[in-house]
A protein has these predicted regions:
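Flexible loop/turn segments at secondary-structure boundaries
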Residues: 13, 64, 91-94
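Activation segment
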Residues: 15, 35, 65-67, 85
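Divalent-metal coordination cores built from histidine and acidic residues
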Residues: 69-103
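Di-metal (Zn2+ and/or Mg2+/Mn2+) metal-binding site signature of metallo-dependent hydrolases
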Residues: 51-75
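Histidine-rich, glycine-flanked metal-binding segment
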Residues: 1-5, 10-55
Length: 104
């Protein structure tokens, strides 16, 4: 059984195909089904009227210094960004910190 079903969202999958309204199932943190009818789960989230899309990778940021006090790189998560690239302007404090190497 799935842990979570996100029901009725407008699904934009990032492939370039037309968005479609449907359900997405998740089990153990992994997407197991997209747009299949009859999905069930322990928890169902009603996403009608909302858009569901993959996380965005921001390849040009200026978070280099900010990451030393704001590991969440806010406000990126509120805008759908799940991964940021730093150091692309020749300045990267975060990369040199031993405590941050797991995130690099």
């Amino acid at each position: 059984m799935n842990d979570l079903v996100i029901h009725g969202a407008l699904i934009v999958d990032g492939s370039g195909s037309e968005p479609a309204i449907g359900d997405v199932a998740v089990r153990d943190g992994v997407i197991t089904a997209v747009c299949q009818p009859g999905l069930t789960a322990a928890e169902v989230v009603d996403a009608e009227g909302l858009v569901l899309a993959p996380g965005i990778v921001d390849i040009h940021t200026h978070y280099d210094a900010q990451l030393t006090w704001d590991a969440g790189a806010s406000p990126s998560p509120q805008m759908g960004v799940t991964t940021v690239v730093v150091g692309n302007c020749g300045f990267g404090l975060e990369i040199g910190r031993a405590s941050c190497r797991e995130r690099v």
